[in-house]
Amino acid sequence: MSYFPWLTILVVLPIFAGSLIFFLPHKGNKIVRWYTISICLLEFLLMTYAFCYHFQLEDPLIQLKEDYKWIDVFDFHWRLGIDGLSLGSILLTGFITTLATLAAWPITRNSRLFYFLMLAMYSGQIGLFSSRDLLLFFIMWELELIPVYLLLSMWGGKRRLYSATKFILYTAGGSIFFLIGVLGMGLYGSNEPGLDLERLINQSYPATLEILLYFGFLIAYAVKLPIIPLHTWLPDTHGEAHYSTCMLLAGILLKMGAYGLIRINMELLPHAHYLFSPWLVIIGAIQIIYAALTSLGQRNFKKRIAYSSVSHMGFIIIGIGSITNIGLNGAILQILSHGFIGATLFFLAGTASDRMRLVYLEELGGISIPMPKIFTMFSSFSMASLALPGMSGFVAELVVFFGLITSPKFLLMPKALITFVMAIGMILTPIYLLSMLRQMFYGYKLFNVPNANFVDSGPRELFILICIFLPVIGIGIYPDFVLSLSVDRVEALLSNYYPK
């Protein structure tokens, strides 16, 4: 047990401080903006301090544990704790949310509510990544939906209500299966229902029940990740949402599904995961190709980037399905790498479309001349997304490749076939990204329009872009910085699959 409640403070601080926004003096938006950014920054500094001085990397066990009785009637506890799996995701959440808050600077309509919802999301995400009770995990999973729905439906494009409704229907539908799985786990095999993850790790289930529970959880994660065919909410949502909301969706929300798949399905249901893993790898390989081909056919450049996200999630699914030390570490690396790259591409797409008031590629062209800074950063992050050596995307995809090749679970022919499919997906990625860059930035179409007055990136936007570019390069050059966080925990987790 930790003597100081670091994690409780990290979970409660954003939503509590966010609720005070409504009591700030009504003297324009500047006070609200600076207050929100200060809270995000304070939270990020607190978590960095707590993890630097109170977390031992070489210890694969759960650390900074907290356990408080919450509801007496059915023994429900507020249980928090972190390990190497959740550490990277929590730091990513703090980093991206702070920069997304800074990205939301131009928001003036209902700005108090907007910033409160962003802080409420922050609490939900930190709570999910640090919860050690399955019911608390589910509550945090659901807490996320309300702010996202409101952010989508109130700030965005013309079809924002349609995309917000589609998002809530998909995620609420997945949550029903999640809740059934939670209840099934809690009520099985004991007179007193308990959902402590420490106890559930040692719980064994009949084969049929374990497969049903696994499948129920998988549907919920398949919506969030997303896994095809439950992905269609994502392009609509990213096409309509404000770019600061897109940063949170692409950077953190999609990663919650991957985290749940590792934390719940792999850790608590190892036998079912061992059975399902070949199917996960096949689905991941199909997803890489399918989403890349679909992305190539998109006229709206925001939707093209959204489908590229779906394609990159395929590598995470393959890494999780490979059941190897290398593959799972590669999946965790890809979670963080895509968190940085995906969030930035949506930020760049949003800022560019705000300036041009255009999103269709055939209407664009020649904007590299009036907007050289946006062009440079867009090109740099597109290169990171297509896995250019020296950037985080390359290392993550390469490690997942090696994880699949070294997996003892698969025979040589299936390995060769899936590797071939992944390679085709990696070839398609530069095709759709570079063709998007060519259509947007090269040529003379918009440059020759009379009275066209395009403004390049300002200091605030450049600061956000450089802040994210540094870790992308850093992870690409020295991936061990991230892998060292999770390597011991991954080894402990996989000991359930391959006992020594």
Curated annotation (Swiss-Prot):
InterPro entries: NADH_Q_OxRdtase_chain4, NADH_Q_OxRdtase_chainM/4, NADH_UbQ_OxRdtase, ND/Mrp_TM. The chain crosses the membrane at residues 4-24, 37-57, 87-107, 113-130, 134-154, 167-187, 211-231, 242-262, 274-294, 313-333, 334-354, 386-406, 417-437, 462-482. It catalyses: a plastoquinone + NADH + (n+1) H(+)(in) = a plastoquinol + NAD(+) + n H(+)(out); a plastoquinone + NADPH + (n+1) H(+)(in) = a plastoquinol + NADP(+) + n H(+)(out). Keywords: Chloroplast, Membrane, NAD, NADP, Plastid, Plastoquinone, Quinone, Thylakoid, Translocase, Transmembrane, Transmembrane helix. It is a multi-pass membrane protein. It is an enzyme of class 7 (translocase). One of its GO terms (cellular component) is chloroplast thylakoid membrane. This is NAD(P)H-quinone oxidoreductase chain 4, chloroplastic. It comes from Hordeum vulgare.
